[in-house]
Amino acid sequence: MKKELLKKIYSEIKKYDLIYIVRHIGPDPDAISSQIALRDSIKYTFPDKKVYAFGASVSKFKYIGHIDKSMDYDYENALVITLDIPNKSRIDGLNVDKFKHVIKIDHHPFVENFGGIEYIDEKACSTCEILLDLINNTRLKMNESIARTLMIGIISDSNRFLFNPVNENIFFKVGNLVKKYKLNLQDIYSSIYMKPMSEVRLMGYIASNMKVTKNKFAYIILENDIVNSFNADASSASNMVNDFSNIDEFVVWLFVTYDAKNDLYKVNIRSRGPVINEIAAKYNGGGHKFSSGARVKTMSELDDLIL
């Protein structure tokens, strides 16, 4: 943790009356939770500031909070804070190159500079953990709602504290958070992991139809008509990749879904050993060493990635 840099970020936040907070395309709970928690903390601390969280809303994650509608941007006077994004091409909601004032906060390996203050902590289990550090080490305020939102991001991105990096520090921080704000962990876990029977049936289909190679690599291409037949959507199907992390027969697994709106294939990749983010980076993606995503336009590109 770099306390002086956290204080510098707080000083920058204090300067600006207009703040835009953005995260990556195809968001997960950590990305959305970090947006909402930071927006709400800044507004709670500075009620007169105009603070917005931008990006496509995802119905599956409405329980976390609301995303603001896009607007005409003030490129000269606004401060942009990017969260959970290592590269510009994955920013959802705006073109960061058009803005004069930018802060980047992330826990992924460094890919490129965004042109302003950069706070990257690869030892953090989530971007929400970094924001917890930011609030704990500055005069930003927190309430029970903000604390709950941060917990959602921390729990989900660490997969219930199973994924590295997880160490004694995060348990100390989370313990204090639960104690101070009397958080209901059972309620939080239910919000994250409760799912309808239709999704469980889809998981059964996936388990029955995944292809597994002799090299312990598993993959499945989930066409939308199959997903829809289970009353699920592509986003929900894609996020099920995390539910297959403890299967002995494979160490790397990959889910493919089709994004009809953007006419491309979304690829979620997970690993229990081999480093995968370097491969994902070659296909318009990236992420962590053992948890990454990619986006490809054609079936030929998809075949290259898989094979």
List each model region and its residues:
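Solvent-exposed alpha-helices and their adjacent loops that cap or buttress functional pockets
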Residues: Y73-D74, N95-D97, V111-E112, M142-E144, ...
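Short, hinge-like loop/turn segments at secondary-structure boundaries
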Residues: D68-D72, I120-K123, S271-R272
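Active-site cofactor/cluster-binding pocket
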Residues: Y63-I117
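Short alpha-helices
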Residues: H107-K173
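Conserved beta-strand segments of alpha/beta enzyme cores
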Residues: K50-Y52, H101, E118, K141
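An acidic intrinsically disordered interaction segment
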Residues: M1-K7, S89-I91, N95-V102, K123-L131
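Glycine-rich, phosphate-binding/catalytic loops in enzymes
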Residues: L38-R39, D97-K100, I120-D121, F172
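Hydrophobic helix-and-loop "lid/oligomerization" segment in the mid-to-C-terminal part
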Residues: K2-I25, P29-K62, D72-L79, S156-I306
